Curated annotation (Swiss-Prot):
InterPro entries: FKBP20-2-like, PPIase_dom_sf, PPIase_FKBP_dom. It is found in: Plastid, Chloroplast thylakoid lumen. PPIase activity is unaffected on reduction. It holds the Pfam family FKBP_C. Belongs to the FKBP-type PPIase family. Residues 1-31, 32-67 form a transit peptide. Interacts in vitro with LTO1. It catalyses: [protein]-peptidylproline (omega=180) = [protein]-peptidylproline (omega=0). The keyword Endoplasmic reticulum does not apply. It comes from the Eukaryota. SUPFAM superfamilies: FKBP-like. This is Peptidyl-prolyl cis-trans isomerase FKBP20-2, chloroplastic.
């Protein structure tokens, strides 16, 4: 079992404080130091991938996310974990879905050792590797996906919509975490991608997303097509993929 703590704040700042008390109540001192960690290099129906799309989870040791977060007792953490598991069962979350223990800005993600955390902060697990080459910039990828929120509730699915999504790589058509997640997939591959807030979509009144959360996607890469730009009558051009 591996854990990671994440926060939407970047770069992360960690305060280390030590309070010293002498035998005399009047003599008290507090020593603090500030350290900075380096920065880490569903969906509205079909529109997620295209809002996923058109607008711009764990593994490894735990990382501190907030200086003001009170330390939780093991009992509090177990209680929050059981609460998250209960909600995921009610939402019919898929097997081995990661658990999220959230308190304020601090999020602890719990998952099996089958998950891998990339240097970028993206977390993924391959269920089937597939065969062939990885997609390149300019190529079109065709894929199915199911999107979930932290509580395991399904927020979108191309399977339900009845047709897969098609996106050209390297055109900023996907949020960073989603494109990173499929960039090293092969046709026929199936992968679960856990996108941390810093690699996810923007939030706010003008977007589909109201708060910074981890997003989870089960992705099946169907095919990769080459694309070329053609010019018609000297001034109009478009891109065709086959």
């Amino acid at each position: 079992m591996v854990t990671i703590l994440s926060t939407p704040l970047s770069p992360r700042l960690t305060f280390l404080c030590e309070t010293k008390l002498s035998l005399s109540r009047s003599n008290r001192s507090v020593c603090c130091s500030l350290s900075e960690e380096p920065k880490d290099q569903c969906l509205s129906r079909r529109s997620l991938v295209y809002v996923l799309v058109a607008s711009p989870c764990l593994l490894l040791p735990a990382l501190s996310s907030s200086a003001k977060t009170k330390s939780k007792s093991p009992y509090d953490e177990r209680r929050l974990l059981e609460q998250n598991k209960r909600i995921q069962r009610e939402n019919n979350a898929p097997d081995e879905f990661p658990n999220f223990v959230r308190e304020g800005f601090e999020v602890k993600v719990l998952a099996s050792d089958n998950y891998i955390k990339a240097d970028s902060g993206l977390i993924y697990r391959d269920f089937n590797v597939g065969q062939g080459d990885f997609p390149k910039d300019g190529q079109q990828v065709t894929f199915h996906y199911i999107g979930y929120n932290e509580s395991g509730r399904r927020i979108d699915s191309t399977y339900i919509q009845g047709s897969p999504a098609r996106i050209r790589m390297g055109t900023n058509a996907l949020v960073p975490g989603f494109e990173m997640g499929i960039r090293d997939m092969k046709p026929g591959g199936r992968r679960r991608i856990i996108i941390p807030p810093e690699l996810g979509p923007p939030v706010g009144p003008s977007t589909f997303f109201s708060s910074k959360q981890f997003e989870v996607f089960d992705v099946e890469l169907l095919s990769i097509q080459n694309c070329e730009r053609r010019t018609i009558i000297g001034f109009y051009s478009d891109v065709t993929c086959s």
